[in-house]
Amino acid sequence: MKKKYRVIILQILILIFIISINGNFLIGVFWITLHELSHIVIASSYGCKFNNFKINVLGAKAEICEIEELSEKRKLNVYLAGPCFNFIIAMMMYILNYKYNLVIFENSVKINLSLGLFNLLPAYPLDGSRICEILR
């Protein structure tokens, strides 16, 4: 069996496993997509072009053209946009949960805090690795 097909089958099996364990999978995909969109919005405001968006069970990636041509400060802003988005949304969801006490808000707080912190880890291909490269 070709490697390409094995990877697809593995991703489908992982996806089935995740969905069967946690009903919050779609909420997570929603917040991951908006996390990547925040990178695109900030990069676009600096004149970069959006090339492609890829999502699979291992993560998501927004491909942005001309990002290497940006100043270090602007690149830092682009890379920080995703985690900052997640932390802001987590605070908003916390306030909504405090007021309305709905499970979806509580789960969104947990998901966004996790996404924000996870993406700040200094491990490639996460945002944290790119942030560390700039701050060195």
PLM feature spans:
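Hydrophobic transmembrane alpha-helices and their immediate loop junctions
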Residues: 1-136
